[in-house]
Design a protein with these regions (language model features):
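Functional transmembrane alpha-helices
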Residues: 1-138
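Cytoplasmic/organellar membrane-interface segments at the starts of transmembrane helices
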Residues: 60-62, 116-182
Length: 182
């Protein structure tokens, strides 16, 4: 996603740079949430290898729901902040070079496959041998873990529904971009 941000800046367009600001916010919030939740998974299972997990949804439904929401936000699903950033950058790239836009979109599709695969390996299916003995003792998220998750997810949704909350303050600065490219 940071590569997409660089492409948005390189487009030297109001749409591309504005999209970059939105994507940087969305990426920061969604990745912070994913890191926090990944740490919760590792602390609960004692396992770093996602291919040795599985089935955690049954034991930790809140953790799974937040992880899925963070993954979908990171993928740029509509209603999350990342969506508007990615859409704006891709639109600016289309105006610049449809080929570069297509390559960037392909990268986003590959990223989506990896994100959904990680979720499926950790939370879906049956518990693997590495975590099966302690599976019934794995706790769900605590209140202290849910609170920051709710705050980050709410921020992602708020900006997803109201992207102008971030971009409205940038209009004067972004409008100067066309004069920089002459």
């Amino acid at each position: 996603h940071m590569g997409l941000c660089f492409l948005g800046i390189a487009s030297m367009s109001v749409l591309g740079v504005g999209g970059t600001v939105l994507l940087m916010f969305g990426h920061g919030a969604s990745v912070a949430l994913l890191f926090m939740l990944s740490n919760a998974v590792v602390n609960r299972t004692g396992e770093w290898d996602m291919f040795k997990m599985g089935g955690l949804y049954k034991q930790t439904p809140n953790l799974a729901a937040f992880f899925l929401a963070a993954t979908l936000a990171s993928l740029g699903l509509p209603m999350f902040a990342n969506f508007w950033g990615e859409l704006s950058i891709l639109a600016s790239l289309w105006n610049f070079s449809p080929t570069i836009c297509a390559l960037a979109a392909t990268g986003l599709i590959i990223s989506a496959i990896y994100g959904l695969r990680a979720f499926a390996n950790v939370f879906m299916g049956e518990p693997k041998d590495a975590i099966a003995p302690k599976f019934s003792q794995i706790p769900d998220l605590t209140f202290a873990e849910k609170l920051p998750a709710v705050i980050l997810l709410a921020a992602l949704l708020f900006v997803g529904f109201c992207p102008k909350a971030i971009t409205s303050g940038l209009n004067a600065d972004l409008s100067a971009i066309p004069t920089l490219t002459k």
